[in-house]
Amino acid sequence: MTVYRYVRLGQLAARKERGTWRVAESALELFQRDDGSDTADAVSRRSAPWSDRLSNRLLEGDSTGAWKVVEGALTAGLEPLDIYCDVIVPALERIGTAWENGEIGIADEHLATMLVARLLGRLGPSFNRRGRRKGVVVVAGPQGERHTLSLAMAADALRAGGYSALEFGSDMPLAEFERQLRAWLPLKGVCVGVLNGEAVDAARQMVAAARRIVGPTVPVV
């Protein structure tokens, strides 16, 4: 395997400068310790640092390389839901922490987020199950909430479980949320997602409204 391919797979950290990939000596030493070869056994491949590899590609704006990392993890035996929970989410957390610490700029964080949205779009169909659905679950975020990736991943997890997930996205007005709940009754569940601390009160209002509308026995989370 060429050095270029190791870079595109996220196994060797590098930065692109004026059309040329440059590898720091520390990154090369780390790569040599980890031994990124393809001859490792299945257990080693499953436990490879996939999330670190992905975050490297995301921060470089490398959509092709990011997808190759995902493909590599799937080939190693990870399930699509594992990719969400053990690869994508930790990669986003790492990037978010880097932004909070001033190590990267907001543009870098936004670039990574948009690339992840594209990854979810490609992975999404793999969560669909054949056969009859168990019922409908509404997934939405309250007004003031701007994050949508977590809602999309939750909806895909529900689809993998055999449910029809209705994604209404984030920043959902309460009155419209209530209207949609009534329109889709009976429901099997309601999922309200919030990451923004300033939107917590709005999320509580959504949960309370959902409980009134769907009744005491339907899960509202």
Predicted segments with their positions:
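C-terminal regulatory/effector modules of DNA-binding transcriptional regulators
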Residues: 102, 118-221
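Long amphipathic alpha-helical segments
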Residues: 2, 9-129
